[in-house]
Amino acid sequence: MESSNQFLGTERIGKLMQKYAIPCIISLLVGALYNIVDQIFIANASYLGSYGNAANTVVFPLTVVALAIAVMIGDGCCAFVSISLGQNEVPKAKRSVGNAVVMCLVSSIVLTALYLIFADTILAMFGGTVNAETYHHSQEYFFYITLGVPFYMFGQAMNPIIRADGNPRFAMIFTLAGAALNIILDPIFIFGFRWGMMGAAVATVIGQLVTAALAVWYLLHMKIIRPEKGDYRLKGSICGRTLTLGMTSFLSQISLVAAMAAINNMIRKYGALDAVFGQEQYAQIPMAVVGIVMKFFQIVISIVVGMAAGCIPVVGFNMGAKKPTRVKELFTKLLLAEATVGAVALVLVELLPWQLIALFGSANESVYYTDFAVKSFRIYLCMIILACVNKACFIFLQAMGKAAESTALSMVREVVFGVGFALLLPRFFGLDGVLYSMPMSDILTFLIAGYLICKTYRELSTKGEV
């Protein structure tokens, strides 16, 4: 049986990148906007300010845990489907989608229950006890955000699956709809009703609910890989292969959570020893500042990951169809595009940090806030070009079916280097050591990624063409 995706093996690479990467970038940017928009409105509410910002920073890694599970299932299914379609095995692709839906629903319910039961312990683990006001806001925000976890996970998991069905445009639209609603509701709930952190969270959950509802509608109207009733029965081999293919996406996100937990706790520990930030009224500033730096980084990485993840169906199809020359061409163009994005971001953080900070309510804050924020942007993101190239390498290896290499590289970056430097450098440089942990991690990771890039080119050059 021929699938309608055969054009993936014949269309110009540049055109395919535009078709698949641009909607994926927009989808990821829009998805990132949920938390970023919350933080912008929270920061500009005078009754929340840096305390609300710090609370958002505490809760953010916990939403990434949900995202990690969702993208493991969704990206794994996307890769499975793309390879299956390249081999003309459509029934297997449909079964993968059905199994992915069930795995997502079960895991989201379990995670929601765990969050509700162990909320206080979890918040303390991620630095929520920096001061009493921050902890109060963290509790409120986390409770309502947790109620939306099933909707959030389902929408995020379905996004790459919808792209694999050959409809990247709808994947973009259904995510955009939820985020647009969130942007509309945030100022109403935060400034109009003065619901504070609860208002920001409720606006987010409503947006996620709309996205999930649209994803369900599309699932029932898929073009190529709509599951039949029997496809929803879990099959061990398909679940295992899906999770294996998506493991890099999971570890990339979950290891980032480990790094953020280490960073948050080092900020809490060494901020308390600082002459300024050791004072109760300023204790939340380092946590809030690192949070806004990470939000800017999230925007950049959404573009980078969107480019690479959008190419997964193209890579998977051409690998399955034994067309290595096209895969090599795609890899080259992707690396150049990712490096360009990183270069633009570097110019912004080095030359215009004040403008970036102003988005997050600096007018309502002390000079200590602004000074530390400028320094944080310039140090923490000084190697952002390498970070972009590293991310592209992680995802491309995953798309080629090299799950072991991709997973290992991702783990080394976030856990060995990320957590390691976050714990080590503050011992010698205090609070500044936390800021230097990211560029150091990116430099060492790039040395390994460079080797894998060269190795991948050699392998693609020696593969036979069909």
Which residue ranges define each predicted feature?
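Short alpha-helical transmembrane segments in multi-pass integral membrane proteins
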Residues: 1-21, 81-148, 192-247, 315-383, ...
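N-terminal transmembrane alpha-helices
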Residues: 9-48, 61-76, 80, 105-112, ...
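Transmembrane helical elements of multi-pass membrane transporters/channels
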Residues: 19-38, 144, 178, 207-211, ...
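Residue-level hotspots within pore-lining transmembrane alpha-helices
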Residues: 26, 30, 34-37, 66-70, ...
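Short runs within selected transmembrane alpha-helices of multi-pass transporters and secretion channels
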Residues: 27, 144-163, 171-179, 200-213, ...
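Helix-terminus/linker motif at the lipid-water interface of multi-pass membrane proteins
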Residues: 29, 33-54, 123-132, 188-195, ...
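Small-residue hotspots at the loop-to-helix junctions and early N-terminal turns
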Residues: 50-61, 138, 142, 201, ...
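Small-residue-rich hydrophobic transmembrane alpha-helices
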Residues: 53-113, 152-171, 287-347, 351-353, ...
